[in-house]
């Protein structure tokens, strides 16, 4: 539908917008588009390693039209993030 197409276009342009939920220091290079189940990951970090560990963060960001709701999967992700249930894993393949 036209609403879906408009939403998909706006999702991709979000890094270039001004909005209260977008920190002013984020640049478009700080954003990675995912699309599904969340729209973006924002890498809010610093080049200095110690400062980064102290104040840097990774932001999961979803773009919604004014009245649309999070999907069940998006709510689950939000709840796990808020509960601190995130871990790092690395897989090395030879």
Go through each PLM region and give its residues.
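Eukaryotic charge-rich
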Residues: 61-64, 71, 75-76, 92-93
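General small-molecule cofactor/ligand-binding pocket signal
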Residues: 87-91
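Acidic-basic catalytic patches of nuclease active cores, encompassing PD-(D/E)XK
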Residues: 1-38, 43-48, 70-86
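Conserved catalytic cores of phosphodiester-cleaving nucleases, focusing on short active-site segments
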Residues: 39-42, 48-67
